């Protein structure tokens, strides 16, 4: 059903996008299940970068994983967005602000991330599993060290289903993003 909705959105039925399920990549928990910055009780040391330029998901994936291999960034998730852009979820390095990380990662990967940074309460539309290009096992880990107060930061985790092993840590999907 999710894949069908995304195909219809891609075909021009934009109003369906608001019906997609969401997740918060930068926060694990909100007080009283109320998604607001002031109610973020478990923000995560993560930053979701949104690359709006279409058709570059595989190139962004390859460059991101190379940067990870070089020890420059920890990549948690790479997926094609509903509108065929690319989402890259990274671990925010200690002592680096989200703004600095966004700027540095954009320079390193060679594509400009959307300058509108997402706060801890901002959501991302879920996409079908076949849009997922890479998932690190670390995406599903939440440690006391990875959380801080909502006034310091923003982001959350949760995916709709387990991902394919070929899209997990240490491997690159050879499948083309959905068209």
Please provide the spans of the model-predicted regions.
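Short, well-ordered, mixed-charge alpha-helical segments that flank or form enzyme active sites
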Residues: 86-87, 134
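Signature for HUH/AEP ssDNA processing cores
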Residues: 1-84, 91-99
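Short Gly/Ser/Thr- and Asp/Glu-enriched loop/turn motifs at secondary-structure junctions
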Residues: 80-86, 118-123
């Amino acid at each position: 059903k999710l894949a069908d909705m995304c195909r219809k959105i891609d075909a021009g039925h934009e109003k369906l996008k608001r019906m997609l399920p969401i997740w918060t990549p930068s926060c694990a928990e909100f007080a009283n299940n109320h998604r607001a910055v002031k109610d973020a009780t478990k923000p995560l040391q993560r930053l979701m970068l949104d690359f709006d330029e279409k058709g570059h998901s595989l190139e962004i994936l390859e460059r991101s994983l190379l940067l990870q291999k070089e020890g420059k960034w920890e990549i948690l998730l790479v997926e094609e967005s509903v509108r065929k852009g690319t989402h890259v979820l990274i671990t925010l390095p200690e002592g680096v602000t989200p703004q600095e990380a966004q700027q540095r990662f954009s320079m390193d990967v060679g594509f400009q991330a959307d300058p509108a940074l997402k706060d801890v309460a901002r959501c991302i539309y879920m996409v079908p599993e076949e849009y997922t290009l890479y998932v690190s096992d670390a995406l599903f880990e939440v440690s006391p060290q990875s959380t801080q107060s909502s006034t310091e930061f923003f982001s959350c985790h949760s995916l709709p289903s387990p991902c394919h092993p070929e899209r997990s840590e240490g491997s690159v999907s050879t499948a083309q993003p959905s068209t």
